[in-house]
From Swiss-Prot:
Predominant place of localization: cytoplasm
Binding residue positions for substrate: T197, T198
Keyword terms: Acetylation, Cytoplasm, Lyase, Metal-binding, Zinc
Function: Catalyzes the reversible hydration of carbon dioxide.
Family: Belongs to the alpha-carbonic anhydrase family.
Acetylation recorded as keyword: yes
Protein name from the UniProt record: Carbonic anhydrase 1
Cofactor(s), by name: Zn(2+)
Pfam families cross-referenced by the UniProt entry: Carb_anhydrase (PF00194)
Keyword Cytoplasm: yes
Compartments where found: Cytoplasm
Record EC number: 4.2.1.1
Binding-site residues for Zn(2+), renumbered to this chain: H93, H95, H118
Length: 259
């Protein structure tokens, strides 16, 4: 596998040399211009059903941390919205900045948030996540912005596991967590056709970006930044600025579920 990261030598502007699709027609993230998004009355409300017992573990993969879910049944799913069929939750992860003025991957009229949550789902018309990931309608990712405010009690349960996964390659069991507790109260969203935001940058994602952010405190953001890109025994390198900047829209349309 090609090494990639977020530094000056292996960061997003260098990915194209190993992953030429980085310059493709439907890359993510994007800057969402609310005025340029068209309201589509045909977009249904999102239907999310998550089973906390599907939650398996939390791990530091050296690019972010992710919480993984058992995806061998239809007990944690995303339906409706802009998609057809049933998509199963595979994992969720975050992207964040070194300071509170940056960190999200999507931006809204140029506004950056300090972090962004991604809930990754795969289309069950394909036999596995791995196969779905290369299909144009294979994945659906729900993106949620984090905005500085009150401490987020649901998020705190995730952050409390960080002591066990500080370094790259570490993982620990993480059970009975309901990811729906991380969703905003209002599920109005923008949607567009895009890609994974990390290599291999496959153009297989229906993006569903929630309009309403969830809260995170400054202290909680500091906890995100205590994770390490580096493995144990290596020089410590704080995990910050693990986001890809917005990519060209290239004629794509962004639709809104709300007026």
């Amino acid at each position: 596998a090609h090494a990639w990261g977020y530094g000056p030598t292996d960061g997003p502007d260098k990915w194209v040399s190993n992953f030429p699709i980085a310059d493709g027609p439907r890359q993510s993230p994007i800057d969402i211009l609310p005025g340029g998004a068209s309201y589509d009355s045909g977009l249904k409300p999102l239907s999310l059903k998550y089973d906390p017992s599907n939650c398996l573990e939390i791990l530091n993969n050296g690019h972010s941390f992710q919480v993984t879910f058992a995806d061998d049944s239809d007990s944690s799913t995303l339906k409706e919205g802009p998609i057809s069929g049933v998509y199963r939750l595979k994992q969720f992860h975050f992207h964040w900045g070194a300071s509170n003025d940056k960190g999200s991957e999507h931006t809204v009229a140029g506004t950056k948030y300090p972090a962004e949550l991604h809930l990754v789902h795969w289309n069950t018309k394909y036999p596995s996540f791995g196969e779905a990931a290369s299909k144009p309608d294979g994945l659906a990712v729900v993106g949620v912005f984090l905005k500085i405010g009150d401490a987020n009690a649901s998020l705190q349960k995730v952050l409390d596991a960080f002591n066990d996964i500080r370094a790259k390659g570490k993982q620990t069991s993480f059970a009975d967590f309901d990811p729906s507790t991380l969703l905003p109260g209002c599920l109005d969203y923008w949607t567009y056709d895009g890609s994974l935001t990390t290599p291999p940058l496959l153009e297989s994602v229906t993006w569903i970006v929630c309009k309403e952010p969830i809260s995170v405190s400054c202290e909680q953001m500091a906890k995100f930044r205590s994770l390490l890109f580096s493995a144990e025994g290596e020089p410590e390198c704080c995990m910050v600025d693990n986001y890809r900047p917005p990519q060209p829209l290239k004629g794509r349309h962004v639709r809104a579920s709300f007026q």
